[in-house]
Regions:
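Fold-level signature of zinc-dependent metallopeptidase catalytic domains
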Residues: 42-79
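Short linear proline/tyrosine/threonine-rich motifs used for host-factor recruitment
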Residues: 182-184
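Pan-zinc metallopeptidase signature
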Residues: 219-316
């Protein structure tokens, strides 16, 4: 559990409240353990988990790289087919232009050995386990799988697929270091994680790099919900997707909404709704999802409706 590794999870013992300090409520003490930072088990199981880029230097010691370094590493990598190289250089240009403060060293490290595999639908299904998949980044292999015979024109779905998979490659990195330790740098938190919500936020990050409005977004329903929520928030932006975990997002939602550990309840419901939709179960109990709509509506109205507004102003 997270508690048993408090120190290794990035909470120094001197930060813990003294036992005799009665003023600290138990919840607050507990909350200190809830945010995913890192777990360093290199001395026991030869594993290091980094959920928050504030701790990246536990894994990566080289200096930050320039855009030119990124372009060079893409050009030098023989496992990236030539047709993808200009696309990937363009992706890097946009990330550097739009998100100058995100941590990109894991991405640089991934790009050194990244392989892009053009495959058939059957081959893609074997790695993605998803019949609806158009592409897949497999962290354990550091490979992007995409369907063969696609043209990657800006504005097309296939263009979005490449940006989506590159965004996974930017955010997550699994590798073995020179001392034989397995290193996991990932958005998937220790204390909260699900696939649809993580995918939706990754999708939003990917399409935010376009210079046009993209309405047909992967994980559409969840993406739309997160788009509204993030636009309302003054304490979270898509930079934070790269720099922090999904648990951090939940914590920022709670802080923004002045809730006590409620965001993960909503995220769990959104995860269920996604799976119910594909299992054709959403009609069975539609009111089960009402808290999601209430939550998003309250955020939106709280942000945009002001006391004394006319109906016209409110509609605008």
């Amino acid at each position: 559990s997270a508690n048993s590794g408090a120190d290794s999870a990035g909470i120094d013992s001197e930060d813990e409240p003294a036992a005799e300090n009665e003023e600290v409520p138990e919840e607050e003490e507990k909350k200190a353990f809830e945010l995913d930072t890192y777990l360093d088990h290199r001395d026991m199981t030869h594993r290091l988990y980094i959920y928050d880029m504030d701790y990246i230097e536990k894994a990566i010691s080289f200096e930050k790289k320039s855009l030119q370094d990124f372009e060079e590493v893409i050009r030098q990598n023989p496992k990236i087919p030539d047709k993808f190289k200009p696309l990937m250089e363009e992706y890097c240009k946009r990330v550097f232009g739009k998100y100058p403060d995100v941590e990109l060293r894991p991405f640089y490290q991934n790009l050194q050995s990244l392989e892009v595999v053009e495959c058939t639908e059957d081959e893609l299904l074997k790695v993605s386990w998803d019949v609806y998949s158009c592409g897949c980044y497999v962290k354990s292999e550091n490979k992007i799988y995409v369907l063969k015979d696609k043209e990657y024109e800006e504005g097309t779905w296939d263009y979005q697929v490449i940006f989506h998979e590159l965004s996974h490659c930017l955010r997550d990195s699994h590798y073995t270091d020179e001392d034989g330790n397995k290193v996991y740098i990932q958005f998937a938190g220790l204390n909260y994680y699900d696939v649809p919500n993580a995918e939706a936020i990754n999708s939003l990050f990917a399409v935010s790099l376009f210079d046009y409005e993209e309405n047909d977004i992967a994980y559409q329903m969840q993406s739309n919900a997160h788009k509204i929520m993030i636009e309302c928030m003054d304490n979270y932006s898509l930079d934070d997707y790269v720099n922090h975990s999904l648990g951090y997002y939940a914590k920022q939602l709670d802080e923004y909404n002045q809730d006590d550990n409620y965001a993960t309840t909503i995220l769990t419901l959104m995860d269920e709704q996604y799976h119910d939709y594909y299992d054709e179960k959403t009609a069975e109990n539609p009111e089960k999802y009402y808290p999601i709509y209430d939550y998003i509506s309250n955020m939106y109205l709280g942000k945009h409706l002001k006391a004394g507004m006319s109906q016209e102003e409110a509609r605008g």
